């Protein structure tokens, strides 16, 4: 075929009897609605016999290690489960075919069974909590899984060899309209000083993209008789774990400590630049990351955009960011300044990916720069312009092969250990 095509991801069951086809692996949350999960499952009719084809979509919050499961208690909570009987189609599950499903059924034949899921917009985005250096197995966090299998009923126990499991992601992109420019100020009156110290800080904008430097403008008016010895700037990630009770964890992801002095009765103004990178935070256990799929690297978790009136109990992990500016003031005076000598302000901001440009119906198929398995991409040989690509993400250079993502692992970070 030519060098243009529509990419479709596929994954087959270990026994080779079922294959699921999806048009994408990332599904965008537009706040008021989420991209539908539409695809087809191709079934070997001799294997199907008199059974039915089921597809399930599960959103789960894994918050502990499987090896800690005792007495039937599991460290996992299913936030959302939906089931579709793909074949024979149940009347309540029958929906109009999407353009992708029409093309796939035309190409794959009559044994391709369509399925469609609607993800509620109030569900959390895919977030992974970074494991520690010694941790193995599945990481804690929120993930979405599509599972297809043949059975006489939904309650039938299915072996992994006879099913297809695909981990997909629910993602959000930065809004087109940024919020107001973050600014904050505070005034501190010190003992034995007639006049106060004033700190004002601002960011150059409200939305930053991953990998983009953050400019922090700091202005200090020191009318006291004390000296500002240091100025500490930090970017902090806050993760609200919404499970049984809401707990908040904070972690610095970029820091600068400047020995900039502000003498008594003087002013100071300077712009500091910090860039939060995951590469500089690889050892921080429990740091929130964007949901990670097999063979693909990720980044710091994006800020969570919430709908008004959203139920926080099913939001899983809510991520936010703040820049903290802290002045370290020299202690002095007869009483040694019993009150705290630090003066600080916080500046909330949004850290996200920009919304990608809409892809045209036909697109160039790029040559991969990273090594892939020889069977990773299969090109069809007829006139249709569909490119089938294995669902597994391309392997990163230097990354060892993982076990299949469905394997039960041990050693994930436990929330209580953060």
From Swiss-Prot:
GO MF, one annotated term: cysteine-type endopeptidase inhibitor activity
Region of interest: Interaction with CHRM2: 45-86
PROSITE patterns: ARRESTINS
Main location: cytoplasm
Domain of life: Eukaryota
Processing after translation: Constitutively phosphorylated at in the cytoplasm. At the plasma membrane, is rapidly dephosphorylated, a process that is required for clathrin binding and ADRB2 endocytosis but not for ADRB2 binding and desensitization. Once internalized, is rephosphorylated. The ubiquitination status appears to regulate the formation and trafficking of beta-arrestin-GPCR complexes and signaling. Ubiquitination appears to occur GPCR-specific. Ubiquitinated by MDM2; the ubiquitination is required for rapid internalization of ADRB2. Deubiquitinated by USP33; the deubiquitination leads to a dissociation of the beta-arrestin-GPCR complex. Stimulation of a class A GPCR, such as ADRB2, induces transient ubiquitination and subsequently promotes association with USP33.
Region (Disordered): 353-375, 397-418
Interaction with SRC: annotated segments: 1-163
Modified residues (Phosphotyrosine): 47
Interaction with TRAF6: region residues: 318-418
Binding of 1D-myo-inositol hexakisphosphate, residues: 250, 255, 324, 326
SUPFAM superfamilies from the UniProt entry: E set domains
Keywords: Cell membrane, Cell projection, Coated pit, Cytoplasm, Cytoplasmic vesicle, Membrane, Nucleus, Phosphoprotein, Protein transport, Signal transduction inhibitor, Transcription, Transcription regulation, Transport, Ubl conjugation
Disulfide bonds: none
Modified residues (Phosphoserine): 412
Pfam families: Arrestin_C (PF02752), Arrestin_N (PF00339)
Compartment list: Cytoplasm; Nucleus; Cell membrane; Membrane, Clathrin-coated pit
Homology family: Belongs to the arrestin family.
Protein name: Beta-arrestin-1
Species: Mus musculus (Mouse)
Gene: Arrb1
